[in-house]
Structure formats: structure tokens, C-alpha cells
Amino acid sequence: MAMTPQLAFSRMPPGFRFQPTDEQLVVDYLQRRTAAQPCVTPDITDIDVYNVDPWQLPAMAMYGSDHDRYFFTMAAREAQARRTTPSGFWKPTGTKKTIFVVAGGHEVPTAVKRRFVFYLGHHQPSGSNNNNKTSWIMHEYRLMNSPRAAVPSSSSVNRLPTDDLTEEMVLCRISNKDLPKPPFIHNSLLQFSSVGLNGDGYNYLILDHLEPPAMEYPNVGIGNVDDAAAGTDDPGDLDEEIDDSMQRNHGG
């Protein structure tokens, strides 16, 4: 039987919530997924993220926390990547962040994280004022020197290739900060005896009951913001700092 979001939640302890750090996403999920090794929790959803409007994605996710949902997808190599959906496009904002993983006592650059904001409509020339910015955010994680991705054991995406060197497996975190948090029942830490590849245990699995919120098209949250400049003055950089601070507060 195919795994569905409802079935995935039903198999988790009451109050399960998924809240990994950037390093844990890279080491325990993206690296293991590209190596065809089992991940910590079953089935982060495989889907063509770039061909689906963001408000359709939350209902397709197996796991998430607060405003976040996680997906594996095949993406074109960075230079050829196109991120256009039926209703709009994902626009990069801020600066790329290198994710370091501790190996052999040294911090090794392992992946790159990049932030995108979803805009309704078609691409506009750089520097133009675009009033169709929404509240949908995507953080895209790519391995540096990415190996060829393996076919998932179960996937709704039939196009995932094994031998196309123009594409690579990436992990996407989709969120909408303007949407209300889902209802939580518990507020305690779920500890596991098994230890992750990074040696600190799976302490990012939190006991907080989560029901996927209804995220529909009217809630896209259009704003009047011009973020054409992509540098240290970009609002995305401040959001990155806030995002990193929140991860540290959760033990990342």
C-alpha cells in the first residue's frame, strides 16, 4: 500500500513533529537519500516541486513542523535550473549559504542552501517593481559535488532519472510564515536511542501533535515588496539570520 501523509502521521507517536537543523537535513537525509540508504524517518515525499504551485504542496508532504514541509525532488544543475510553476515562479533572494559538516574533527563544506520567494505571474526584468510577491518561501539544499541520485523505493514521481548527469537530487523546505500554526497537544522532547551519522542523536524529533493545515490559493499572501537587489542589503539575508537563530534555539 502506498504511503500517504495521513498514513505516515498515523504511524508516528502522538504529538510527532519533524524539526531538523540544516546539518541534520544534509547528513541524515539528503546524503543518505542520494546514496540509496534508508533515512531516519520513512519517506520524505518525492515530488516535482518546481512543477507544482506551492499552496498545493503541504497536503502532499509526509512530515513537517509549524509552517514547514519537506520534499525531495530532481532539479537541473544550478546553471540550468528553471523554477517556474503553472501560476508563477521561484525567485532567488539573499546570498547562498555553505553548510559545513564535522568529519574527522574538521568542518567540511558539504552542501549549499539557497532561499527563494514565490511570485505570481511571469518573470519580470531584473530591477523592476514586482507587486506579486507572496509569503511562500523555499529553502533548497544541494550537495556539493553531488553524486548521481538513486531511484526512490516508492515515489509518485515517474520522471526521477538515475543516469541523467544534467540533474541532481535536492531537498526543499517549503514554508509560509503568514499562515497560522497547526494545533499542538504536547510539548515535550522525543528521544531516540539510535545515533545519527553526525553523532548527536535524533533529538530533532519533537513531540508536538501536528495536523497539516489547509493551505489554499487565497492565502498566498501577496505583498508590495521590491527585492530585486540580491546582496547583503536583500531582506532575504535578514530572514536567513532569523532562520539560523531559530535553528540554534532548537538545539541545531
From Swiss-Prot:
This is NAC domain-containing protein 23. Residues 12-177 form the NAC domain. GO terms for biological process: regulation of DNA-templated transcription; regulation of seed development. PROSITE patterns: NAC (PS51005). Forms heterodimers with NAC26. One of its GO terms (cellular component) is cytoplasm. It holds the Pfam family NAM. GO terms for molecular function: sequence-specific DNA binding.
